[in-house]
């Protein structure tokens, strides 16, 4: 395996069964990696939107309390609505954790694809990241 970038239409990507032996196969592989990079950028924006929606849906005092921690002088009693709010916060946090795991897995797949040192794959990742950023980041400003 070369330790420098090469232009080639032959490569083994991520798994042994993903062997590329033709220009058509390389073009399809670049497309798959490009889409993975776009998905990675989309998930980053999705995580930010999910956190923003979660914090908006909670009352201001509760969302600040969950971020900053409970007050020192709070008593041990909690109301039913407080418990529901905590459960909803936990479920949102659990969902964000799952989305984060998916983002990490996709990120490592993209990184390992680049580590094939194939220039076409590298360019696909760069282009996919650019396209994903271009498409996804304007969604952050939408409410």
Curated annotation (Swiss-Prot):
GO annotation (BP), single: regulation of copper ion transmembrane transport
Bilayer topology term: Multi-pass membrane protein
Record's GO cellular component terms: late endosome; late endosome membrane; lysosomal membrane; membrane; plasma membrane; recycling endosome; recycling endosome membrane
GO MF, one annotated term: copper ion transmembrane transporter activity
Extracellular side: 1-22, 115-119
Main localisation: membrane
InterPro entries: Cop_transporter (IPR007274)
Changes after translation: Ubiquitinated; ubiquitination and the subsequent proteasomal degradation are prevent by SLC31A1 that stabilizes it.
Disulfide bonds: none
Function (record text): Does not function as a copper(1+) importer in vivo. However, in vitro functions as a low-affinity copper(1+) importer. Regulator of SLC31A1 which facilitates the cleavage of the SLC31A1 ecto-domain or which stabilizes the truncated form of SLC31A1 (Truncated CTR1 form), thereby drives the SLC31A1 truncated form-dependent endosomal copper export and modulates the copper and cisplatin accumulation via SLC31A1.
Family: Belongs to the copper transporter (Ctr) (TC 1.A.56) family. SLC31A subfamily.
Protein name: Protein SLC31A2
Origin species: Mus musculus (Mouse)
């Amino acid at each position: 395996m070369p330790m420098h970038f090469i232009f080639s239409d032959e490569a083994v990507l991520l798994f042994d069964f993903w062997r590329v032996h033709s220009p058509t196969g390389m073009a399809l592989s670049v497309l798959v990696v490009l889409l993975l990079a776009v998905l990675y950028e989309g998930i980053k924006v999705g995580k930010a939107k999910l956190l923003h929606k979660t914090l908006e849906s909670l009352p201001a005092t509760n969302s600040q309390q969950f971020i900053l921690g409970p007050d020192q002088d709070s008593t041990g009693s909690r109301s039913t609505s407080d418990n529901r709010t905590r459960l909803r916060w936990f479920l949102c946090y659990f969902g964000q954790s799952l989305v984060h795991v998916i983002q990490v897995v996709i990120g490592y797949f993209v990184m390992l694809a680049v580590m094939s040192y194939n220039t076409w794959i590298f360019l696909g990742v760069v282009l996919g990241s650019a396209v994903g950023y271009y498409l996804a980041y304007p969604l952050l400003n939408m409410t």
